[in-house]
């Protein structure tokens, strides 16, 4: 499956964030596609199980054909909300729930198929054989075109990769969250051809004041002048340079910020600059 270089994350489109109107969603979809972002990331739980429906209404109102975009969704998290009055957040990867979740997403997103469906988080009770059989059933029915996972470590990916092809893994990865670079996650994905999608790709840079971010900021001031771009573009281009071909999932609903994110994919950091930025994040030289 080929995705756009930047993926538009929809978690904050609805009541969990910017509470966009149907018209605003429609315009955002149209503008995103115009600027080259044709892939939209969803999860059944976003907006307390309401954001997919909002997107679907916006898609119908837009001038965009379904075939011109790619829709990703995630299932498995049972999240207490008005639409799901349960007491305990948990994970459900039973056959019935997987099928029901995918079918609900199809209805809400106003589509006949999902380009990729992801297990939202690993569960200590996930049954690999039952999940693989169910996903294969969905693939054969053409309700989904590919299968992926989210927040999986190399061992968990390996278990499923022996049963069913994993197209992608959504992971938390940024200049302030380097675990996937060092714990073998990106190494494994690169060796198996699994596409990494990075959620929260700007990390904690704009959210926290600490020594790490102060060091990073000093380098960004230097390199945004050299490359004639913004701080955010340096943060994204630093991720994109990784040979595993990381695709940032960007959560902005502002079209100028989205275009800025797309433009970051054309910035090719020099090797020594990439390591200088890494050194600022870690706080010491590479070993």
Model regions and ranges:
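Short, acidic/polar
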Residues: 19-32, 93-109, 130, 153-157
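Surface-exposed, active-site-proximal loop segments in enzymatic domains
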Residues: 79-92
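Active-site groove signature of glycoside hydrolases
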Residues: 106-125
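Alpha-helix N-cap and loop-to-helix initiation/capping positions
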Residues: 20-24, 50, 54, 89-97, ...
């Amino acid at each position: 499956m080929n995705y756009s270089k930047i993926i538009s994350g929809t978690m904050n489109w609805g009541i969990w964030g910017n509470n966009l109107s149907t018209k605003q969603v429609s315009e955002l979809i149209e503008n995103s596609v115009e600027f080259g972002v044709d892939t939209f990331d969803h999860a059944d739980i976003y907006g307390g199980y309401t954001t997919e429906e909002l997107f679907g209404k916006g898609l119908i109102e837009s001038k965009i054909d379904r075939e011109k975009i790619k829709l990703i969704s995630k299932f498995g998290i049972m999240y207490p909300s008005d639409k799901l009055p349960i007491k305990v957040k948990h994970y459900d990867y039973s056959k019935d729930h997987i099928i029901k979740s995918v079918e609900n997403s199809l209805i809400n997103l106003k589509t006949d198929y999902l380009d990729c469906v992801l297990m939202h988080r690993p569960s200590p009770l996930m049954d690999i054989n039952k999940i693989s059989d169910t996903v294969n059933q969905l693939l054969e029915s053409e309700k989904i075109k590919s299968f992926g996972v989210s927040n999986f470590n190399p061992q968990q990916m390996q278990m499923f990769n022996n049963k069913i092809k994993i197209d992608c893994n959504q992971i938390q990865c940024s200049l302030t969250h380097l675990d996937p670079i060092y714990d073998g996650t990106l190494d494994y994905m690169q060796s198996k051809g699994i596409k990494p999608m990075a959620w929260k790709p700007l990390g904690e840079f704009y959210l926290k004041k600490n020594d790490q971010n102060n060091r990073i900021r000093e380098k960004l001031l230097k390199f945004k002048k050299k490359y004639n771009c913004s701080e955010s573009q340096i943060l994204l281009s630093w991720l994109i340079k990784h040979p595993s071909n990381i695709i940032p999932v960007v959560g902005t609903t502002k079209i100028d910020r989205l275009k800025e994110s797309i433009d970051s994919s054309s910035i090719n950091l020099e090797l020594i600059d990439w390591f200088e930025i890494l050194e600022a994040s870690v706080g010491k030289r590479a070993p």
